[in-house]
Amino acid sequence: MTTLNPAAVKPSTSASRTQGDQLRASPAVRAAIDALVNEFRAHSAKLTAIRPALSPELKQSFDQFIEKAGSIRGRAPLYPFIGSGIGNGPFVELMDGSVKIDLITAIGVNFFGHSEPDLIRAAAEASIGDICMQGHLQMNQEPTQLSELILNEAKKRSHLAHCFLCNSGVMANENALKVCYQKHAPASRVIAFRDCFMGRTITMSQIGDAAANRQGLPLSTLVDYMPFYDAAAAKRMSAGDASGQARFIDQSIARLREYTERYPGQHACFIFELIQGEGGFNTAPTEFFRELATVCKDAKIAVWDDEVQTFGRTERMFAFDTLGLGDMVDVVCIGKMSQVCAILFTSDYNPKPGLLSQTFLGSNDALSVGRKVIEKLATGDYYGPSGRIARHHKIFTDHVHALAKKHPG
């Protein structure tokens, strides 16, 4: 299946082209978008190094705005960051005219940096539309185009068959939980890894393993926690005829079977966070996940892969693909870098009508920019053992190891 491209099938005569097609193809509109992108380039190019506030007056105005933001929100922003609306790759200008280096990228949301011309163009093109926010009751072409693009990438090495968009990562997780509950009703328990993070709705705050995120909340979700892979513990366990890794995995399997035997038929899903971010940048070998997923398959427990934070950021677009687990996943959640979030699922997990809805699935610019992001990732030199992500990872880890060697303990 190829990505939808209405331009490729447009009739040649204007009489048989929609007004929408004619507007988007208008020379005046195309020239205006070109001019906008070029103007962004010109101003963005001037931001090439960090600098302080441009004046005491701007700094004072910035501080006052931060204070006002905190008063309105009920708490100050996590960081004293109010952007001016322009940047240049890793450089971003703040409201006071100072320029900072962005090492956070909104936790992967702004993967391509600030004022990326291709994304500015995609957002400008998205503004040529009759509505701002799309949903299942009023949908233009963009949601289906983005969904198909995501699904085509996911289907390359998995059994995933459907993609359902939503407007936040935690909503993707909520949708995934409902899909798993419905498929395995009346099972009501959930298995998750220790130190996982799921989002901040009332249900996801209960599943996420952070007590501070559920203070004062009534507890209604039954969660059993599994230990995530611990390389240091595995190394300590290495002895005799079995490696430490194998021993650790065997212990984890025993723990999982203890849960499934204690609560037979009561678990709807096991949430696999293949790389833990909030929990401390924890990783695990493929064998660890595969063995646990095999137990889940035997016990008829859904294998749910939460990639809201990791999507697009490993050596392949999907972390399940990087780890060779495409044959095991039943449900996958993505977000952040994709701009619009989504749940993907196999045909066996396609829910009954009424369970999911998309009244407010995403804005035009998020849908358009998300599509461009995935196109750039899919066609650029980003993936594989020699791709840009792998090369950057090696540079980073080499420096970390050098620092650790220089400052042991």
Residue ranges and their predicted role:
Residues 2-409:
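Conserved N-terminal phosphate-binding loop of PLP-dependent enzymes in the Aspartate aminotransferase
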